[in-house]
C-alpha cells in the first residue's frame, strides 16, 4: 500500500506558544483518517501546514513524495481542500464555478468539461449544473465545495468540518459521499464531531494541546469501546472476596451497599460467572448490565488524561 502523506516531527510556534508539538503520522492510499481534537488543540494549524498555507517551525511534510516546502507546486497539485467555510461564488451557476476552479487547478482546456462532469457525478450534482449556487441548500453547497476539491483528481482530499450546519439528512448524505471518496482517494476529515469519525473513517487520530495523543484504527477503537466493566445490583450484600477469585476481575467498585461495578479484562465476559455466584449464594440479582464505553467517553478520558499529566 503506497503512502500518500508523510508528516515527520512537525512543530509550529507562535511566539512562546507551541500550537503543534512534534507531530508525526502517515496516510496510506484508500484510508479515511479522522483528525479529532477540541477547539484550540492544533487541528487547523496542522491542516494549514499540510496544505502549504503555513510554514512549520520545524518538521517535514511530503505529499505523494513531494516536499511541501521544497516542491510546493507539485505537492499542492496532489491535494484537494475544502475549508470549513466553502469558497463559493453564490452568483455563479454550479457549472460556471466548477469550470473556473478547473482553470485555477491548471486543468487543460480540452479536459475541463470532462473534469467538471466527473466532479458533478461523484458529488451527486449531475442535474445541478445550471442552478445558481446561491439558490442551493447548505447540503448541496457543501457538495459543490467537495466537487471543486476533486476536479483535478488529487491523491489526497482534506475536508475541514464538512457537516457543520447541515440537517440530519444532509449529514447522512455527506457521510456517504466521504466514504465513497475514500474508495478512490485518501481523505483527511478534520472535525470535532465524534460520530462523524465512527461513521466515515477507517482510522482516527486525536490531537490535544498540540500533541498526538491517539492514533488508532476504527477496529482498535471499537475494541476500546467494548465492555470492560459490569454493573450489578444484589438483593443481599455479597461476599466481595468471591469476585476477586474470578481470574479476569481487575477491581471492584462499591457504588452502594447492594450495587457494584466489577472491572475486568477486555475481551472477556464475566456476567455468567457473576450470575452463577449470586444464585449459588442466594444474593438475588436486581440488575446485571455490561457497561459499554462510547466514543465520547474515550475522547474525554484521553484528552482529560493528557491534560492532567501536563
Language-model segment annotations:
Residues 266-310:
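C-terminal coupling/interaction segments
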Residues 173-265:
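ABC transporter nucleotide-binding domain
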Residues 100, 118, 241, 276, ...:
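Surface-exposed charge patches
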Residues 29, 127, 236, 264-266, ...:
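Non-catalytic surface loops within mature trypsin-like serine protease
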Residues 60, 132, 229, 284-287:
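Residues at or immediately flanking beta-strands
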Residues 124, 248-253, 284-289:
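A short linear hydrophobic-aromatic micro-motif
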Residues 2-7, 12-208, 214:
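ABC transporter nucleotide-binding domains
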Amino acid at each position: 500500500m503506497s503512502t500518500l502523506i508523510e508528516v515527520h516531527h512537525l512543530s509550529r510556534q507562535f511566539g512562546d506558544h507551541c500550537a503543534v508539538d512534534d507531530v508525526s503520522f502517515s496516510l496510506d492510499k484508500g484510508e479515511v483518517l479522522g483528525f479529532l481534537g477540541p477547539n484550540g488543540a492544533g487541528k487547523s494549524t496542522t491542516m494549514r501546514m499540510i496544505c502549504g498555507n503555513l510554514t512549520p517551525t520545524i518538521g517535514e511534510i511530503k505529499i505523494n513524495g513531494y516536499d511541501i516546502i521544497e516542491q510546493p507546486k507539485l505537492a499542492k497539485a496532489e491535494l484537494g481542500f475544502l475549508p470549513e467555510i466553502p469558497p463559493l461564488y453564490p452568483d455563479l451557476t454550479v457549472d460556471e464555478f466548477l469550470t473556473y476552479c478547473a482553470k485555477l487547478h491548471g486543468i487543460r482546456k480540452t479536459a475541463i468539461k470532462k473534469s467538471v462532469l466527473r466532479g458533478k457525478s461523484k458529488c451527486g450534482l449531475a442535474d445541478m449544473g445550471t442552478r445558481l449556487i446561491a439558490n442551493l441548500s447548505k447540503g448541496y453547497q457543501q457538495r459543490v465545495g467537495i466537487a471543486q476539491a476533486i476536479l483535478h483528481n488529487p491523491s489526497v482530499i482534506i475536508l475541514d468540518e464538512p457537516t457543520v450546519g447541515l440537517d440530519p439528512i444532509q449529514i447522512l448524505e455527506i457521510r456517504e459521499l466521504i466514504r465513497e471518496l475514500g474508495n478512490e482517494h485518501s481523505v483527511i476529515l478534520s472535525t470535532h464531531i465524534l460520530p462523524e469519525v465512527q461513521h466515515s473513517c477507517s482510522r482516527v487520530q486525536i490531537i490535544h494541546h498540540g500533541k498526538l495523543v491517539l492514533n488508532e484504527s476504527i477496529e482498535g477503537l471499537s475494541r476500546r469501546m467494548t465492555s470492560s466493566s459490569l454493573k450489578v445490583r444484589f438483593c443481599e450484600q455479597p461476599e466481595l472476596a468471591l469476585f476477586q477469585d474470578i481470574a479476569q476481575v481487575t477491581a471492584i467498585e462499591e457504588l452502594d451497599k447492594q450495587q457494584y461495578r466489577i472491572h475486568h479484562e477486555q475481551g472477556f465476559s464475566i456476567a455468567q460467572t457473576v450470575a452463577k455466584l449470586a444464585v449459588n449464594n442466594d444474593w438475588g440479582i436486581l440488575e446485571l448490565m455490561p457497561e459499554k464505553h462510547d466514543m465520547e467517553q474515550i475522547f474525554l478520558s484521553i484528552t482529560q488524561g493528557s491534560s492532567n499529566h501536563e
